[in-house]
């Protein structure tokens, strides 16, 4: 920056400069607190489709890693799987939101998730200065699976049985960002399609993560026409009973508190359609999404 620019003190210039400075100062205690901690981020929804949002996400993840936070990504890719299946003349069928997965479909799932989707995320992070490594859940037994409880209907859809935390820790300790495709296999070598939310939750619990962050298409938990910045287990139960929280949000909320019970520090639900939503949620006092906490009163983003 030249000398003239440094001495530009017009109100129009000073206002944004002051705002930027305030944000950076506000972030400092959070950066100190979270250095060396592990964040598991589930990446999905519109943030995986829009180019601007994809770049914003990659920048956010790279910055987290640069300030000393261990970042573990678990990604979805349902739309990409459906498109690939259509190109191959295979129709996708869903039961209660879960993809029916036969032997042909599991091949497409592997090819799409562990292939193009995973590699695109790794490439994008690398373009923004991060060091990411693609991980299939099959690699080094990262995700060990068992058939889901209604396998007779869903086919090769699995549930997480165990996580190889040693392998993930090895990658994080090397300064890398593991980008994990949610597929796994059982003791007999059968490969399973695993729900990305469930995989992220299991990985966060196994790693004893400080935070699990869901990057989604909703701004957070809505109650009485406003987004709740914080919700406790007691509040959630009351809102479900009062039909304030309804429909598909109920299992998400229940799952979030089960993850908290598993030992994860906090759960965050944020809107992936908001530019830099991860940084704003983690490094500012107000945040931009909803954080789930075990007890009311611990309601800051720390």
Curated annotation (Swiss-Prot):
MF annotations from Gene Ontology: acetylglutamate kinase activity; ATP binding
Coiled coil regions in record: none
Pathway: Amino-acid biosynthesis; L-arginine biosynthesis; N(2)-acetyl-L-ornithine from L-glutamate: step 2/4
Main location: cytoplasm
Record's catalysed reaction(s): N-acetyl-L-glutamate + ATP = N-acetyl-L-glutamyl 5-phosphate + ADP
UniProt site positions, description: Transition state stabilizer: 42, 252
Protein function: Catalyzes the ATP-dependent phosphorylation of N-acetyl-L-glutamate.
Family note: Belongs to the acetylglutamate kinase family. ArgB subfamily.
Protein name (Swiss-Prot/TrEMBL): Acetylglutamate kinase
Gene that produces this protein: argB
């Amino acid at each position: 920056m030249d000398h003239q620019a440094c001495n530009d003190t017009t109100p129009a210039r000073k206002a944004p400069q002051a705002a930027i400075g305030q944000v950076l100062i506000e972030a400092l205690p959070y950066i100190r607190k979270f250095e060396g901690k592990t964040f598991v981020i589930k990446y999905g929804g519109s943030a995986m489709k829009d180019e601007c949002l994809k770049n914003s996400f990659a920048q956010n993840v790279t910055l987290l890693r640069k300030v000393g936070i261990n970042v573990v990504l678990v990604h979805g890719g349902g739309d990409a799987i459906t498109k690939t299946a259509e190109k191959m003349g295979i129709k996708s069928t869903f039961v209660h939101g879960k993809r029916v997965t036969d032997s042909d479909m599991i091949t497409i799932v592997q090819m799409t998730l562990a292939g193009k989707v995973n590699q695109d995320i790794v490439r994008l992070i690398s373009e923004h200065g991060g060091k990411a490594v693609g991980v299939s859940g099959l690699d080094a037994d990262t995700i060990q699976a068992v058939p889901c409880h209604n396998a007779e209907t869903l086919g090769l859809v699995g549930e997480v049985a165990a996580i190889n935390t040693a392998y993930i820790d090895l990658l994080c300790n090397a300064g890398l960002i593991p980008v994990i495709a949610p597929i796994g296999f059982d003791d007999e070598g059968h490969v399973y399609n695993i729900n990305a939310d469930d995989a992220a939750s299991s990985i966060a619990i196994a790693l004893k993560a400080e935070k699990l962050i869901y990057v989604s298409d909703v701004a957070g938990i809505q109650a009485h026409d406003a987004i709740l910045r914080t919700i406790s287990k007691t509040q959630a139960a009351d809102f479900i009973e009062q039909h304030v929280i309804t429909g598909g949000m109920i299992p998400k909320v229940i799952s979030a508190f089960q993850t908290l019970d598993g030992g994860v520090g906090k759960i965050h639900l944020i809107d992936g359609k908001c530019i830099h939503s991860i940084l704003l949620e983690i490094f500012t006092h107000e945040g931009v999404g909803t954080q789930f906490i075990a007890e009311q009163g611990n309601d800051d983003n720390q």
